[in-house]
Structures are given as C-alpha cells and as structure tokens.
A protein has these predicted regions:
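N-terminal export/targeting leaders of redox proteins
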Residues: 1-60, 71, 120-197, 208, ...
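Inter-heme linker and motif-flanking segments adjacent to c-type heme-binding CXXCH motifs
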Residues: 56-67, 73-148, 180-184, 188-264
Length: 264
C-alpha cells in the first residue's frame, strides 16, 4: 500500500474512532449539563401528594402511591376511564364526586373489588388512609414488589418486564372495553447533540399501559410534528416524555433505557 494511502487510511480510522468515542460517551457529558432531579427513595418514587382542596377545607392532603395501584391496573384505567389528568392537582376531585362513584370512588366504594374489600368514603374511621399528607405512606407494602424484575432507577422495578413475564397482570379496563392498540412501531429520534446516540421509542411497551389518547394529541401533537422540538430541557420541564418520566415512570437518569447506545 502506498505511503500516502496508508496515512489517509490511518487518519480516517482515527477520526472514526474519535467520533465513535464522543458518540458513546455522550451520556456523561449530557448528565453533567442537565439538572436531573434528585432521586427519591425507591418506596417514595411514584408517590404524589394531592392538595387541590383538602387544606382549604381543613383536611390533610391526600397521598397517592402509583406503585401500589399499578400492580393491579394499567395507567389508562385512571387516566382515560376515570378521567384523572396527567398533571397533579389539576383534576377536580371532590368528596361529593367520590361518593357518587367517580374518580377514587369508582373502586373505593366500600364494596368488594377483585376479591378485595375496598374502604369507602362514608366511613370516617378510614379517612386517614388517604388524607395523611405523608408522601411515604404505605411504604410498609413496598416489600410486596421484592420479587419483580429489578431496575436501578425509580422505585427499583422494571414494570415493563414484569408485565411481559406475566408476574403482574394489571387490568386494562374498569368498565369500558378499550380499543386494542396493536401498534408495534419503534421510533428512532435523533438527539440534539452529535455526541448523543438516538433515543429509541417503542410504542408497544407504552400501549401495554396506555391508550393512544393519553399521549395524542395533547402531549404529542402528530400533525404539528412536535418531536421537532423534542429537546432534553423541555422534557425536564415536564413536557413530552417528562409528563410521566419525571415522577412515575422510570426517571431520566436512566439514560440507557432511551439511548441504548450511550455509555454512562
């Protein structure tokens, strides 16, 4: 091989190696740039405190644990059928509505549900089960998740694998029959930095929990092609994926779940 050809070949190889190094190590650079929310204890991740009206009416705020409920129901049951908004404290939940069988009262009505006796909204001795203002309420039940597939982040559970392996079988409806969303399309979303590998979005693992309407058109407007504005800073501000992946679904410090080619 001529000398100039060898030199050119070596330069091409070196350049490719440098580009690849930047590409796979980009996660470290990104982690340093973005202010990822501080991790909560596993037993608190996914727990929220609802206080739209409670304090105003002399009651303690309501604590709600997503991980306690998602073992039994998929997200669409509450966020489609029961009409809970995705954003905390924006749903007009009232005690009167609960007693009429709406919102929490759809299940918590003092009757048996899936073989379990549910507490209702007329027994005043039960109020503190929800109205306790304590984000860590119910943590004594966290040990019930011990046998589920592990994940390093969030509450330490890989919920998608738990469903795939049949370890949990959450109900996908309360009374309505959901439309079957047999969508197995995986999207490849280019990152805003050259050094960050693309994000991979699998529809199938999301439709196992959600309806299409949970994301479209409010969170992701397909017609407006909002993924063009799909940058990490907006996700961390609670937009797009950040609606769920900041407080309930696996958190954003789990870089490899979305950017599988990254090395963190």
């Amino acid at each position: 091989m001529p000398y100039k050809t060898r030199i050119l070949t070596l330069l091409i190889i070196a350049g490719a190696a440098a580009a690849f190094t930047l590409y796979v190590l980009g996660g470290r650079e990104a982690s340093a740039k973005y202010d990822i929310p501080k991790a909560l204890p596993p037993e608190e991740y996914g727990n929220i405190v609802i206080d739209r009206l409670s304090t105003k009416n002399g009651e303690k705020p309501v604590s709600f644990s997503h991980w306690i409920h998602r073992k039994k129901h998929t997200c669409r049951v509450c966020h489609t059928e029961l009409e809970f908004n995705m954003k905390t404290n924006t749903t007009e939940i009232t005690e009167a509505a609960n007693r009429q069988g709406k919102f929490c009262g759809a299940c918590h009505n003092g009757k048996e549900h899936d073989g379990v006796q549910m507490f209702g909204h007329t027994d005043k001795t039960q109020c503190s089960k929800c109205h306790n203002g304590n984000r860590s309420a119910g943590k004594d039940k966290f040990k019930e998740l011990a046998n589920l597939p592990k994940n390093k982040y969030g509450n330490g559970v890989d919920w998608s694998r738990a469903v795939e392996q049949g370890l949990i079988k959450p109900q996908h409806r309360h009374t309505d029959k959901p439309l079957e969303a047999d969508i197995d399309k995986t999207l490849k979303l280019e990152a805003e930095w050259f050094s960050i590998p693309p994000a991979i979005f699998p529809h199938k693992s999301h439709t196992a929990w959600l309806d299409c309407s949970n994301c479209h058109p409010d969170i992701f407007n397909i017609k407006k092609r909002t993924t063009k504005h799909f940058v990490m800073s907006r996700l961390l501000a609670g937009e797009f994926c950040g609606v769920c992946h900041l407080a309930v679904a696996f958190p954003m410090d789990d870089c490899k779940r979305c950017h599988p080619a990254v090395v963190k």
